[in-house]
């Protein structure tokens, strides 16, 4: 785990390369919205098993908050089905409904969606793309860490801006209920860890969660999935969609700018 100051020194943000202004996305057929912030391009140095690796990051947008249950429920339960169908919607996969909703005891409205598998997170991003006509994705590790470092936080900042073991009372909290980081993103560190496509080709979770100490959180914090994340799943084979014991794991969407703005289209 690299100290925040060393991490910040590895970042070379390029001015004038933002993808555009911030905007609010709305899911057709619903009242659900979420805000996207532009992230400038740059380069970021990541720690890998083979040593440091510098990755160039093109400009993109990132969601201001972690995905909430309010939005994820629309995807899971099809609350958008009354809206006009979009081209490509027949290829959208939706999760099976969980036997017990992960983290159900925490509450629901305004809280981060959690316990979805990496496959489910990617399918969710595809659904948002089809419904909006814009290309949404689960971030790569380089994109996520680049955005995190732009809002680089000191140890004192993390304690004040993050839901961690010291203040979270072993549960998630409403997104954006803590102050944003210097870049305007909420809960990048803490609350729930966030799925990314790892630089080494594996899926990993970044940023730490409410059950971690604030001192353990940094932009380079990462977790790999273990068997314990779906240990209590009663299904055989176990669900591809849900990790019932990963009540500390969510997702934050990004959008790439070189897409079509025509609704219902989606570039690979």
Regions of interest found by a model, annotated:
Residues 56-157, 255-259, 264-268:
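Active-site microenvironments of metalloenzymes and redox enzymes
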Residues 160-189:
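Short, well-ordered junction/capping motifs at the entry into regular secondary structure
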Residues 1-2:
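N-terminal export leaders
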Residues 15-16, 21, 118, 179-181, ...:
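Disulfide-stabilized, aromatic/cysteine-rich ligand-recognition loop
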Residues 27, 52, 174-177, 241-245:
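Short Gly/Pro-enriched turn/cap motifs at secondary-structure boundaries
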Residues 32-43:
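Mature N-terminal segment immediately following signal peptide/propeptide cleavage
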């Amino acid at each position: 785990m690299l100290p925040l100051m060393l991490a910040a020194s590895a970042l070379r943000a390029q001015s004038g390369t933002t993808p555009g202004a911030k905007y609010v996305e709305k899911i057709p057929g619903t009242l659900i919205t979420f805000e996207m912030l532009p992230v400038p391009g740059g380069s970021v140095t990541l720690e890998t098993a083979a040593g440091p690796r510098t990755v160039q990051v093109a400009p993109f947008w990132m969601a201001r908050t972690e995905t909430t249950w309010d939005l994820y429920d629309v995807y899971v339960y099809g609350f958008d089905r009354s809206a006009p169908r979009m081209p490509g919607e027949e290829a959208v996969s939706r999760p099976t409904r969980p036997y017990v909703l992960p983290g159900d005891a925490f509450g629901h409205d305004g809280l981060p969606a959690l316990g979805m598998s990496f496959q489910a997170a990617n399918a969710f991003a595809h659904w948002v793309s089809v419904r909006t006509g814009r290309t949404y994705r689960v971030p790569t590790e380089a994109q996520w860490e680049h955005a995190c470092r732009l809002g680089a936080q000191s140890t004192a900042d993390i304690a004040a801006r993050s839901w961690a073991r010291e203040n979270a009372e072993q549960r998630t909290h409403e997104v954006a209920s803590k102050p944003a980081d210097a870049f305007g993103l909420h809960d990048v560190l803490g609350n729930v860890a966030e799925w990314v496509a790892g630089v080494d080709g594996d899926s990993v979770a970044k940023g730490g969660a409410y059950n971690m100490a604030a001192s353990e959180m940094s932009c380079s914090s990462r977790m790999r999935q273990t068997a314990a994340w779906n240990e209590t799943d009663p299904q055989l084979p176990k669900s591809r969609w849900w990790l019932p014991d990963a009540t500390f794991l969510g997702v934050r969407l990004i959008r790439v700018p070189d897409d079509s703005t025509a609704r219902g289209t989606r570039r690979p």
